């Protein structure tokens, strides 16, 4: 199909493109061409802005309100993509999963795969919310708005994420056995190359293992996920026990590519709740003098 307009009304498509440090404007690119009917999900905007860290998980209320305004409710199947293969879409997937929405999928290969398969592109702003079924917001009085009955209602699943305290406990063994896997490049992991964000120490969390996120993706422009067998091999070669019933915490620079590993582990057959993401990741850990580091 060339347009999501031809899909059942139960499906919503979301562009969750995000870029790090290369002066690209994801929303501008969305306006220049996106999957027809898609809405734009800004991970920096739909976030907890009370914290000094980037794109941290928003509150239930904020997520409910913003997702409802996109015309998405709890009955919808959400399909997420980004413009760079499989880079930031998994972060949006993980966010929906954090709020207990399980009918959420990532378009493998993203927008490049859509175009390669002959999919058409739509230019300009997304549809006005008022034209979308189940828009999710109704005006109560004056400037006050409230959730429509069919809007999105969030309920946080704490099993999907970890705080720095929980990571520290697992790193030292105080929180029980389990593993921590880092999605950054080996150079960053070993503090051989500087972090892209200023003010961060180099190195990695003690006892963590390095599995660069691109290793679970195919090479090339589409960057699709490898097969389940290949993904398992990548993790196992790094010393990761994919079949363990113990927690396997995914971390990275700021919680984006850690979600790539979390999704890859689900592709490999692991329950997502057993592969939580450390939301603050190295942006938080590497900025704190009171947290232990290896290689800095």
Outline where the language-model segments fall.
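Cytosolic catalytic domains that perform sulfur/thiol-centered chemistry
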Residues: 1-296
